[in-house]
Structures are given as structure tokens and as C-alpha cells.
Amino acid sequence: MKKLKVVHYINNFFAGVGGEEKANIPPEMREGAVGPGMALAAALGDEAEVVATVICGDSYYGENMDSARKEILEMIKDAQPDAFVAGPAFNAGRYGVACGSIAKAVEEDLGIPSVTGMYVENPGVDMYRKDIQIIETGNSAADLRNSMPKLAKLVMKKAKGELVGPPEVEGYHMMGIRTNFFHEKRGSERAIDMLVNKLNGEKFETEYPMPVFDRVPPNPAVKDMSKVKVAIVTSGGIVPHDNPDRIESSSATRYGIYDITGMDSMSADDFTSIHGGYDRAFVVKDPNLVVPLDVMRDLEREGVIGELANYFVSTTGTGTSVGNAKGFGESFSKKLIEDGVGAVILTSTUGTCTRCGATMVKEIERAGIPVVHLATVVPISLTIGANRIVPAIGIPHPLGDPALDAKGDKKLRRELVMRGLKALQTEVDEQTVFEG
């Protein structure tokens, strides 16, 4: 029997190409299995083989989603596979978005059975769970030996046209799809059994789980920005050099509040980035790329804003749990209110950093303060529920372009901040992306 052909998608990290400094590499295709593709090949056994591996940098895909997806689809189409596997991405946000986006497109546009895998808190799960089967994984690559056989088993079922079972059987995240089938007990009996178990305090499982929506209505627009105190919050990991609060480089459990009284710019002598989710080279040289103090001071002097808070709030968003991010936002929002802050600009960098940032945005909004989210990976911000969003420039430099000279870079940063201020002064009744 002829072996089925499988194409595998991985990012630059898993391909062994490099770390964050190589996260901007464009798509390429290699023959055979690469990196975790070896585990996929082993799990497929004698029925299928990995004929090619597509590799792309996470930042490149995140910043060029439409064109990168189109290029990758052409590569996959040329390989003529019978099935496609992306990842697994575990809890890597940018990687998860890429895996979900590509797997969805391969199945819908090319008609090739596809699967991917992610940790439950990966933002890619909520973005693509209704479109594609996403195998539940652990939060790191340590789970590869457990998750890859599940991906292989499911994609082979799909490739051979076999019936795919429910999430609890196959191990994928719930898709919100209901299927009719014959049960050995009629509905009334099952309902009575469920009620009896509930009354007795015993375990029971609903047959119709209700979706949970956590959306916060947008606050009214700022009427007169020239009379309002504005604060800067970031999930981009900017801290003083000694990192006094010992904020972790990933999966943060705390945040910090740092004084900027009398400062006209974020100096590399005073601040650095401890963030583990993007290439910090640009930001270490110029922290204004994440915390736009230089531009905000100019706007304060010009009377565009009433006042800039004499501190900024910072944490590391990469890998940080939704629960922790929510707790951070609830906590520091109380201080913002006590200090009379009337508007917030929140900046984010990578994928899970954007998830963390958008989660904090919702808590700031819930506290009654208008807030705008400046982030490059806009789809994640939308999925999590930010209401006012301004697309940023790039994952490792959201508020500027290091390729420009200092004057041009600052001009670009000012344009972004002004767009953010415009968003804060615009009435919205639904999620709105302010493109410019």
C-alpha cells in the first residue's frame, strides 16, 4: 500500500534556525522531516511519511500574515500532500496564530485534511477552534512525546476519511459543533440521571456546555484630552536595569510601577527589557520603542494631553497566564483611578504578550478608564476583546522603525501615539481597529 504524504509546518525555533534574532525569516520549504517532524514521522508509522517541512519565522508571519499565508499555501500545494500538520505550538502565541491560520487555509482553500496542536491558553485556540481541530497539548515542548501521537492519529483519520470522534475522545479543543447520533438512553432518562447526580453532589457532565463570553463594553470617549492625565502601561517587559521587582522574563507572576518624574525620554542607561518573547536588541538600545516617553513628554508640553502620569506600569506578557494578567489589570487599575488617570495607552509586543496586554486592557476598561491597545498582532487583541486597537509597526519594535534615522523614527512614533489619542477621543460601540 502506498504511503500517504504529509507536509509539516514549524517555526524557526523548532527548525533549529535560531532564536528571536531569526524570527523574521521568510517561508522556506525543506525536503523530509525537520526537528519535531522526526517525532511526527515516528508517530505516523508505516502508513504515511513526512515528505516536506515548511519553515517560517514567527515574527515574519505575524507581521505579514496575508502574504506569508499565500506563499506557504503555494509551497504546500506544490508538494501535493494527502494531509497537513502544523506545530504543535504549545503556549507560543505567535506560533499558535500561524499554525491555526495556515491549517485553516490548507483545509479550506486546498481541501487537504489538516490538524494542529496548542495549549489551552494559546490565543490561537480561541481564534481558530471553530475552524480546525486543535489537539490539546501541555504548555511547553516537554509535552511533545504525548501530543505528537495524538496529532498523527487524528490527521490520519481525516486523511483516510474515517469518522472523527468528539473532543473528549480524540483530544482536541471543543469546537462548538453539535452532531446528532443515536444514544442508548433517551433524553428524558439522561436528564433525570444528571439531576440525581447533581442533587447528590456527584460528578455530572452537561450535554450542552454554554459558551463563556468575557467582553467589556467600551468606555465613553475622552472629551478633551488636553485636560486629562494619561498613563502608559506595557506588557513589553521594560524595567530598570536592576529589575527591582524581579519580574520573570516569561510567565510573569508580578508587575512593576516605575518612576519617570523629570525624564524626557526612556534612556538605555536607566531602562532595559527583560522580555523573553521577542528580539530585544532594538529596545535595549531605545526603550522608547515600547514605552513612548519621548513623544508623550512633547505632547504634554504642547498641551495636547493634560498631564502624563509620573510612572509607567510594566510586566512581561510572554507566556503569562490569562489569570495573572487579569489580576495585574485589576490591581494597578485601582492605583490609576486613585491618581486621577483618565486615559491609558497600553503597548504589547509578541503573541502571548498581546494576549496579556489585551487582557489587562479589558480590566482597565472594566475599571472605567478609556484605554487603547497598540499592538502588532491585531487578530489576538481582537480575539481577547480589546475595544480600541491601533496596529503597531513590528513585534520587536512596536512604536518605531530602527531602520529610520532618529528623527524619522520619532516622527513615526508620534504618528502612532497620536492615532492612539484619536482612538481614545472617538466614540465606539464595538471593537474598532484604527488603521490610520
Swiss-Prot record:
Keywords: Oxidoreductase, Selenocysteine. InterPro entries: Gly_red_sel_B, Sarcosine_GrdF, Various_sel_PB. It comes from the Bacteria. Its EC number is 1.21.4.3. It catalyses: acetyl phosphate + methylamine + [thioredoxin]-disulfide + H2O = sarcosine + [thioredoxin]-dithiol + phosphate + H(+). In the first step of sarcosine reductase, the substrate is bound to component PB via a Schiff base intermediate. Then the PB-activated substrate is nucleophilically attacked by the selenol anion of component PA to transform it to a carboxymethylated selenoether and the respective amine. By action of component PC, acetyl phosphate is formed, leaving component PA in its oxidized state. Finally component PA becomes reduced by the thioredoxin system to start a new catalytic cycle of reductive deamination. Belongs to the GrdB/GrdF/GrdH family. Heterotetramer of two alpha and two beta subunits. Component of the sarcosine reductase complex, together with components A and C. PB is substrate specific. This is Sarcosine reductase complex component B subunit beta. It comes from Peptoclostridium acidaminophilum. The gene is grdF.
